[in-house]
């Protein structure tokens, strides 16, 4: 298993290569390893309440919607809810369905002073396959990481 330092460095290198506006990016298994490493990192799941209920959730994740459902309206209280949930120095791993909303959330968190914001690439459900379906290529669930369904 990689050390937390090696995982942070891997995340940082990806951020530099992709010119990301936040601290880094990790694959789901790397994110889980960092969460288990006891460095105080927290997973922030930014999917909608509907997604959490119908698709599945990660035990122990902080759940703050980036957009609401229905209507996909931006959560105007996202940063305030994040600030209420964790101290600014906490390493945060942002995850959504596929990595787009979590990219935006990590960007906003960084701008709000959460300097250790990391995007979880592939998200919970992964990328679409050739048939346009998720959960077959990458993602938290496909990788076999902990999750539950209502």
Where are these regions (language model features)?
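Short, surface-exposed ligand- or partner-binding patches at beta-edge/loop junctions that are enriched
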Residues: 94-95
């Amino acid at each position: 298993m990689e050390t937390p330092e090696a995982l942070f460095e891997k995340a940082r290198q990806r951020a530099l290569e992709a010119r990301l506006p936040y601290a880094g990016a990790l694959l789901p298994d790397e994110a889980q390893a960092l969460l288990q490493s006891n460095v105080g990192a927290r997973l922030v799941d930014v999917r909608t309440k509907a997604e959490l209920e119908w698709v599945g959730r990660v035990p122990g994740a902080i759940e703050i919607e980036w957009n609401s459902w229905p209507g996909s309206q931006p959560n105007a209280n996202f940063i305030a809810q994040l600030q209420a949930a964790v101290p600014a120095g906490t390493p945060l791993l942002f995850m959504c369905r596929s990595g787009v909303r979590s990219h935006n959330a990590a960007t906003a968190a960084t701008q709000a002073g959460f300097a250790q914001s990391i995007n979880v690439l592939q998200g919970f459900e992964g990328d679409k396959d050739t048939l346009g379906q998720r959960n077959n290529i990458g993602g938290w669930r496909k990788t076999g990481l902990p999750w539950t369904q209502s």
